[in-house]
Amino acid sequence: MRVQICAVGRLKAAPEKHLLDDYISRLDATGRGIGISALPVCEVEEKRRLQGSELMEREAELLLAAIPKGALIIALDERGRIETSEAFAKRIGTLRDSGAADLAFLIGGANGLAPALRERASHVMAFGAMTWPHMLVRVMLAEQLYRAVTILSGHPYHRA
């Protein structure tokens, strides 16, 4: 199963970018042994000066166009379900075992994800009730994906 993070906005060469790249590399190296690989992080950006719901809808179009066709969508949103790392790993393992080919994690921009995109997702998850900057959410998600594959493979990284 291929896993991709797709987000609105671009990360500059900064500590967050280095952390993201490191966790994606670890995810790919560890996950390959259990049938999970990482696709490059996808970044989309709307150049026109749109506002509010019009901007969110356009960002949703860009996100959907950027992910693999037929990918299962997991949306990150503050209204989503909060899970433990173990439950998240189990979800990833179940999706892999059910034959899912591609899994796309979508992160919205400053206004969040369009409601229609959240409804289209097979799962909506949150990293708590707080709002997080999209730069940090990418790193947090990449780390949790890496943690999930270490849990699934029995690697000692996760100590619960």
Curated annotation (Swiss-Prot):
Chain's gene name: rlmH
Chain ranges passing through the membrane: none
The entry's keywords: Cytoplasm, Methyltransferase, rRNA processing, S-adenosyl-L-methionine, Transferase
Organism in which the protein naturally occurs: Parvibaculum lavamentivorans (strain DS-1 / DSM 13023 / NCIMB 13966)
Role of this protein: Specifically methylates the pseudouridine at position 1915 (m3Psi1915) in 23S rRNA.
Protein name as catalogued: Ribosomal RNA large subunit methyltransferase H
Subunit and interaction comment: Homodimer.
Residues that hold S-adenosyl-L-methionine according to the record: L76, G108, F127, G128, A129, M130, T131, W132
GO cellular component, one term: cytoplasm
EC numbers for this chain: 2.1.1.177
A GO term for molecular function: rRNA (pseudouridine-N3-)-methyltransferase activity
Cellular location(s): Cytoplasm
Main localization of the protein described in the UniProt heading: cytoplasm
Family classification: Belongs to the RNA methyltransferase RlmH family.
Superkingdom of the organism of origin: Bacteria
CDD domains: RlmH-like
Top-level EC class: transferase
Catalytic activity: pseudouridine(1915) in 23S rRNA + S-adenosyl-L-methionine = N(3)-methylpseudouridine(1915) in 23S rRNA + S-adenosyl-L-homocysteine + H(+)
